[in-house]
Amino acid sequence: MIRKATVMKVYKDKYDDYKQRHDKLWPEMAEMLKAHGVHHYSIFLLEETGQLFAYLLVEDEDSFSEVAKTEICQKWWAYMAPLMETNDDLSPVSHDLKEVFYLA
């Protein structure tokens, strides 16, 4: 498994909406992620700044790179766009983090 971590940003007045939408994650979104080899996906919020820290395990990069091309992912991005910083294609502005420590 490949460990991945990213940072995104949610608007400060949208924290509750962001959490509520993820609490009710569409079943088809969860199914698609699992079908593309995503496991143990967690998102944490730093309330002082609105930074979101996402951590997930993926089976392989090629399969994971296909997630963004799915129709359900595109719909999810549009649904979440009013709550967070996004790119022109409505994907979240996301910065991959470099792993500097790991204890197995």
Curated annotation (Swiss-Prot):
InterPro entries, per the entry: Dimeric_a/b-barrel (IPR011008), L-rhamnose_mutarotase (IPR013448), Rham/fucose_mutarotase (IPR008000)
Signal peptide limits: none
Active site residues according to the UniProt entry: 22 (proton donor)
Disulphide linkage map: none
Uppermost EC category: isomerase
Keyword Zinc-finger: no
Gene3D superfamilies noted in UniProt: 3.30.70.100
GO MF terms, alphabetically ordered: L-rhamnose mutarotase activity
Pathway(s) of this molecule: Carbohydrate metabolism; L-rhamnose metabolism
Subcellular location: Cytoplasm
Keywords: Carbohydrate metabolism, Cytoplasm, Isomerase, Rhamnose metabolism
Catalytic activity from the UniProt record: alpha-L-rhamnose = beta-L-rhamnose
SUPFAM superfamilies in alphabetical order: Dimeric alpha+beta barrel
GO CC annotation, single: cytoplasm
UniProt EC number: 5.1.3.32
Binding site for substrate: 18, 41, 76-77
GO biological process terms on file: rhamnose catabolic process
NCBIfam families: YiiL_rotase (TIGR02625)
Binding partners and assembly: Homodimer.
Task performed by this protein: Involved in the anomeric conversion of L-rhamnose.
Family: Belongs to the rhamnose mutarotase family.
Annotated protein name in UniProt: L-rhamnose mutarotase
Organism for this UniProt entry: Shouchella clausii (strain KSM-K16)
The gene coding this protein: rhaM
